[in-house]
Amino acid sequence: MALHVPKAPGFAQMLKEGAKHFSGLEEAVYRNIQACKELAQTTRTAYGPNGMNKMVINHLEKLFVTNDAATILRELEVQHPAAKMIVMASHMQEQEVGDGTNFVLVFAGALLELAEELLRIGLSVSEVIEGYEIACRKAHEILPNLVCCSAKNLRDIDEVSSLLRTSIMSKQYGNEVFLAKLIAQACVSIFPDSGHFNVDNIRVCKILGSGISSSSVLHGMVFKKETEGDVTSVKDAKIAVYSCPFDGMITETKGTVLIKTAEELMNFSKGEENLMDAQVKAIADTGANVVVTGGKVADMALHYANKYNIMLVRLNSKWDLRRLCKTVGATALPRLTPPVLEEMGHCDSVYLSEVGDTQVVVFKHEKEDGAISTIVLRGSTDNLMDDIERAVDDGVNTFKVLTRDKRLVPGGGATEIELAKQITSYGETCPGLEQYAIKKFAEAFEAIPRALAENSGVKANEVISKLYAVHQEGNKNVGLDIEAEVPAVKDMLEAGILDTYLGKYWAIKLATNAAVTVLRVDQIIMAKPAGGPKPPSGKKDWDDDQND
């Protein structure tokens, strides 16, 4: 009989062999804080217009060169459970606002770093948490008073482009004026009267070659495809969309046919040809002059399409088919039947064009109220275009936020310093031990202008003391001047560097929640990982169409 080895007494004897558990301040809380600090330190250097790029190679060996925190975190696949909570908070920020993910990380990291100092002094975790929650509520009370202006007219391209400039600046510093104008044109052209703006209605088509300044906006959709038949341009297009292959419906029968004469050979496939001819003619008779199909196109069907002057476009992606249906107002038909008038889509012109050396099919809507707008991006490398696409995404999301709430607060660290100043003076009035946590919460706001200053290569302490001095005089809108070679400050409202109110509101809320959640953990219990080989960690979604 095998010798029985007794387990160590205590918590471990209840768990299966191989399980790990950590408890108490030293093992659990400080370790978690350390992991979150490391994560915040990674993305902190990418904060702001002068932030550095990160080169990330993911598990599929795809290369990303970007300073967009959301992309960096998504591709890093963070394993540490506490750091994962902060990553989740930044994902929530991306879903809620679409921008400000790095703010959440930097701020949450600063909160936890300062919480560690308080815990080492001897405060209890519950006192730190209570202080942080009081300070967060206070920050949300102060924030509406810091609003410096509101968007007046979201249908004015010049005004919208000036408001989008700040969010694009942090991703594409130097190209922000041109890109903001492009995005403003695209957003304003499809902004419905109801005021419900859908970010999916702005499409991006990336075409290699030329430079960023050759990018343009089109009302309608652009596909990197070629037409199948001879017809390459149609004006006043009536469009029939099919989700099935453009082919005859013939049952596959196995059998041997004995053909004795040439006439029999001629007649053998005539019935099939006549049927195909009748089908294509029926479609042409409805007035449809463009057919878009989601499957393969048979040679015979192509021949008859050319005969009846029908333009044929093949889209492999079901997502593209859906978006096209939405753009032109068509219904995708599952069988090759002639469409009725309601099922056909309309647009002003469909034509084959060449951008650089890439063939594209353009479905153009001249009307200003087209359902979908496409930004055609040009760039010298794929990585550059991917990064510009992320900047466009941020710009479009900022426009969406402005349609929900038009209020704006000053950027460049001005809002953060004002919040820090007011929350510190509020902390002085609190009698309990929470006042230390409230003051540290205020100090955490300094991490934002500090990161901006460090990334711009100026002395952070000097900048922050200058900002405090100016804010003490009552200039709420003064922030860091990142373009100056020396530590300098300027009025953000005059410079046009503005952040959305909602973006700041949610970022403070989510960062505080994440930090408090991490602090609340006092035990980590990890079961032994299941044995056996790990499944291949390839792409989660086998249907790759949505990325086309």
Curated annotation (Swiss-Prot):
<dbReference type="GO" id="GO:0005874">
    <property type="term" value="C:microtubule"/>
</dbReference>
<keyword id="KW-0832">Ubl conjugation</keyword>
<dbReference type="InterPro" id="IPR002194">
    <property type="entry name" value="Chaperonin_TCP-1_CS"/>
</dbReference>
<dbReference type="GO" id="GO:0007339">
    <property type="term" value="P:binding of sperm to zona pellucida"/>
</dbReference>
<keyword id="KW-0597">Phosphoprotein</keyword>
<keyword id="KW-1017">Isopeptide bond</keyword>
<feature type="cross-link" description="Glycyl lysine isopeptide (Lys-Gly) (interchain with G-Cter in SUMO2)">
    <location>
        <position position="539"/>
    </location>
</feature>
<dbReference type="GO" id="GO:0005737">
    <property type="term" value="C:cytoplasm"/>
</dbReference>
<feature type="binding site">
    <location>
        <position position="100"/>
    </location>
    <ligand>
        <name>ADP</name>
    </ligand>
</feature>
<feature type="modified residue" description="Phosphoserine">
    <location>
        <position position="23"/>
    </location>
</feature>
<dbReference type="GO" id="GO:0044297">
    <property type="term" value="C:cell body"/>
</dbReference>
<feature type="binding site">
    <location>
        <position position="499"/>
    </location>
    <ligand>
        <name>ADP</name>
    </ligand>
</feature>
<feature type="modified residue" description="Phosphoserine">
    <location>
        <position position="162"/>
    </location>
</feature>
<feature type="binding site">
    <location>
        <position position="412"/>
    </location>
    <ligand>
        <name>ATP</name>
    </ligand>
</feature>
<protein>
    <recommendedName>
        <fullName>T-complex protein 1 subunit theta</fullName>
        <ecNumber>3.6.1.-</ecNumber>
    </recommendedName>
</protein>
<feature type="binding site">
    <location>
        <position position="102"/>
    </location>
    <ligand>
        <name>ATP</name>
    </ligand>
</feature>
<dbReference type="GO" id="GO:0045296">
    <property type="term" value="F:cadherin binding"/>
</dbReference>
<dbReference type="GO" id="GO:0140662">
    <property type="term" value="F:ATP-dependent protein folding chaperone"/>
</dbReference>
<feature type="binding site">
    <location>
        <position position="103"/>
    </location>
    <ligand>
        <name>ADP</name>
    </ligand>
</feature>
<feature type="modified residue" description="Phosphotyrosine">
    <location>
        <position position="505"/>
    </location>
</feature>
<dbReference type="GO" id="GO:1904874">
    <property type="term" value="P:positive regulation of telomerase RNA localization to Cajal body"/>
</dbReference>
<feature type="binding site">
    <location>
        <position position="100"/>
    </location>
    <ligand>
        <name>ATP</name>
    </ligand>
</feature>
<keyword id="KW-0547">Nucleotide-binding</keyword>
<comment type="similarity">
    <text>Belongs to the TCP-1 chaperonin family.</text>
</comment>
<feature type="cross-link" description="Glycyl lysine isopeptide (Lys-Gly) (interchain with G-Cter in SUMO2)">
    <location>
        <position position="534"/>
    </location>
</feature>
<keyword id="KW-0206">Cytoskeleton</keyword>
<feature type="cross-link" description="Glycyl lysine isopeptide (Lys-Gly) (interchain with G-Cter in SUMO2)">
    <location>
        <position position="260"/>
    </location>
</feature>
<dbReference type="GO" id="GO:0005832">
    <property type="term" value="C:chaperonin-containing T-complex"/>
</dbReference>
<feature type="binding site">
    <location>
        <position position="101"/>
    </location>
    <ligand>
        <name>ADP</name>
    </ligand>
</feature>
<comment type="subunit">
    <text>Component of the chaperonin-containing T-complex (TRiC), a hexadecamer composed of two identical back-to-back stacked rings enclosing a protein folding chamber. Each ring is made up of eight different subunits: TCP1/CCT1, CCT2, CCT3, CCT4, CCT5, CCT6A/CCT6, CCT7, CCT8. Interacts with PACRG. Interacts with DNAAF4. Interacts with synaptic plasticity regulator PANTS.</text>
</comment>
<comment type="function">
    <text>Component of the chaperonin-containing T-complex (TRiC), a molecular chaperone complex that assists the folding of actin, tubulin and other proteins upon ATP hydrolysis. The TRiC complex mediates the folding of WRAP53/TCAB1, thereby regulating telomere maintenance. As part of the TRiC complex may play a role in the assembly of BBSome, a complex involved in ciliogenesis regulating transports vesicles to the cilia.</text>
</comment>
<feature type="modified residue" description="Phosphotyrosine">
    <location>
        <position position="30"/>
    </location>
</feature>
<feature type="cross-link" description="Glycyl lysine isopeptide (Lys-Gly) (interchain with G-Cter in SUMO2)">
    <location>
        <position position="224"/>
    </location>
</feature>
<keyword id="KW-0969">Cilium</keyword>
<keyword id="KW-0143">Chaperone</keyword>
<dbReference type="GO" id="GO:0070062">
    <property type="term" value="C:extracellular exosome"/>
</dbReference>
<feature type="binding site">
    <location>
        <position position="101"/>
    </location>
    <ligand>
        <name>ATP</name>
    </ligand>
</feature>
<feature type="binding site">
    <location>
        <position position="499"/>
    </location>
    <ligand>
        <name>ATP</name>
    </ligand>
</feature>
<dbReference type="GO" id="GO:0044183">
    <property type="term" value="F:protein folding chaperone"/>
</dbReference>
<feature type="binding site">
    <location>
        <position position="170"/>
    </location>
    <ligand>
        <name>ATP</name>
    </ligand>
</feature>
<feature type="binding site">
    <location>
        <position position="504"/>
    </location>
    <ligand>
        <name>ATP</name>
    </ligand>
</feature>
<feature type="binding site">
    <location>
        <position position="169"/>
    </location>
    <ligand>
        <name>ADP</name>
    </ligand>
</feature>
